[in-house]
Curated annotation (Swiss-Prot):
Keywords: Disulfide bond, Fimbrium, Signal
Disulfide bonds: C38-C78
Further remarks about this protein from its record: The operon is cryptic under classical laboratory conditions, but is functional when constitutively expressed.
Protein source organism: Escherichia coli (strain K12)
The encoding gene: yraH
Family: Belongs to the fimbrial protein family.
Protein name according to UniProt: Uncharacterized fimbrial-like protein YraH
Effect of disrupting the coding gene: Deletion of the operon under classical laboratory conditions does not result in any major effect on E.coli capacity to form biofilms compared with the wild-type strain.
Compartmental location: Fimbrium
InterPro entries, A to Z: Adhesion_dom_fimbrial, Adhesion_dom_fimbrial_sf, Adhesion_dom_sf, Bact_Fimbrial_Adh_Pro
Signal peptide location: 1-22
GO cellular component: pilus
Stated induction or repression of this protein's expression: Expression is negatively regulated by H-NS and subjected to cAMP receptor protein (CRP)-mediated catabolite repression.
Length: 194
């Protein structure tokens, strides 16, 4: 080999060796693709919840709530055979991942969906909170629910599970600062089987 070729090869080896030594760690991805998963039992996959109409004066203080409105996410075709979860448990269960992709959350209130308007002017000074109906736990938005809110898929369920939730408005300002208008929001639902 000539001197130029040897120098070029030595330079390339040094370049690649430097890249290999420059790492500070590694990321190991672990997961599983399930053969089947629960499906929302509605043709358009949309659950509509009518929260009602309220006077701003009904919210007397910051944190005041409207009446709680129960609703259900009906699921079918859920897998009934258990699998290993992140916590090591082997069971047929899932958690909810609720995302506010369109409007986000109310600033300084990460678990309140920011309201907007589907047709008109949006109200301000309130947000929408979602709770688990059974436990009363606040459902986190844009974050994974904790292990305290896990929905089991019983073997005798034939793959049918109802997720019962509650929604309501919560004021984030004093009544004089609430502006009237539409108080709508969309929250996207993902079932997480970790």
């Amino acid at each position: 080999m000539n001197k130029v070729t040897k120098t070029a090869i030595a330079g390339l080896l040094a370049l690649f060796a430097g890249n290999a030594a420059a790492t500070d760690g590694e990321i190991v991805f672990d997961g599983e693709i399930l053969k089947s998963a629960c499906e929302i039992n509605d043709s358009d996959k949309k659950i509509e919840v009518a929260l009602g109409h309220y006077n701003a004066e009904q919210f007397r203080n910051i944190g005041e709530r409207s009446p709680k409105i129960p609703f259900t996410i009906p699921l079918v075709n859920c897998p009934m055979t258990g699998w290993e979860h992140d916590n090591g448990n082997v069971e047929a269960s899932f958690r909810l991942w609720l995302e506010t992709r369109d409007n986000g959350t109310v600033p300084n209130f990460p678990n309140l969906a920011k309201v907007g308007s589907f047709a008109g002017i949006a109200a301000t000074g309130v947000g929408i909170r979602i709770d688990d109906a059974e436990s009363g736990n606040i459902m986190p938005l844009n974050a994974m629910g904790n292990d305290n809110t896990v929905y089991q898929i019983p073997a005798e369920s034939n793959g049918i599970v109802n997720v019962d939730l509650i929604a309501y408005y919560v004021s984030t300002v004093v009544p004089s600062e609430i502006t009237p208008g539409e108080a709508d929001a969309i929250v996207n639902v993902t079932l997480d089987y970790r």
